[in-house]
Curated annotation (Swiss-Prot):
The keyword Transferase does not apply. GO terms for biological process: lactation; protein stabilization. The keyword Transmembrane does not apply. The modification Phosphoserine is found at residues 102, 119. The lineage of its organism: Eukaryota, Metazoa, Chordata, Craniata, Vertebrata. InterPro entries: Casein_kappa (IPR000117). The record marks 58-59 as: Cleavage. The gene is CSN3. It comes from Rangifer tarandus. Its main location: secreted. GO terms for cellular component: extracellular space. This is Kappa-casein. The modification Phosphothreonine is found at residue 98. It holds the Pfam family Casein_kappa. Kappa-casein stabilizes micelle formation, preventing casein precipitation in milk.
Length: 122
């Protein structure tokens, strides 16, 4: 155990020999592409190892535009309704029983008049 006295440490620091890495391990740490020095130390641009596609769980996917709206059928309110005039012929039957002022029973059939009436239905 080595005693390290430093003016910036309020108490003496004891370094353990097992905590010191070998030069080969330190070299591996310096070669890693993920290490980025502080911004003040970046004299030359460094390349960061990035994934070509970020994970989908971290991506915010905006909803589709047509999901926000409810499909409402378009109704053309300007279109005019053309009414077709259809002539309709109805038979009107008038049944008139002619009664005389006498008390005798009339055995004849009642008169039947049939008139043709034409009306227009809109």
């Amino acid at each position: 155990v080595a005693l390290i006295n430093n003016q910036f440490l309020p108490y003496p620091y004891y370094a353990k020999p097992g905590a010191v890495r070998s030069p080969a391990q330190i070299l591996q740490w310096q070669v890693l592409p993920n290490t980025v020095p502080a911004k003040s130390c970046q004299a030359q641009p460094t390349t960061l190892a990035r994934h070509p596609h970020p994970r989908l769980s971290f991506m915010a996917i905006p909803p589709k535009k047509n999901q926000d709206k409810t499909d409402i059928p378009t109704i053309n309110t300007i279109a005019t309704v053309e009414s077709t005039i259809t002539p309709t012929t109805e038979a009107i039957v008038d049944t008139v029983a002619t009664l005389e002022a006498s008390s005798e029973v009339i055995e004849s059939a009642p008169e039947t008049n049939t008139d043709q009436v034409t009306s227009t239905v809109v």
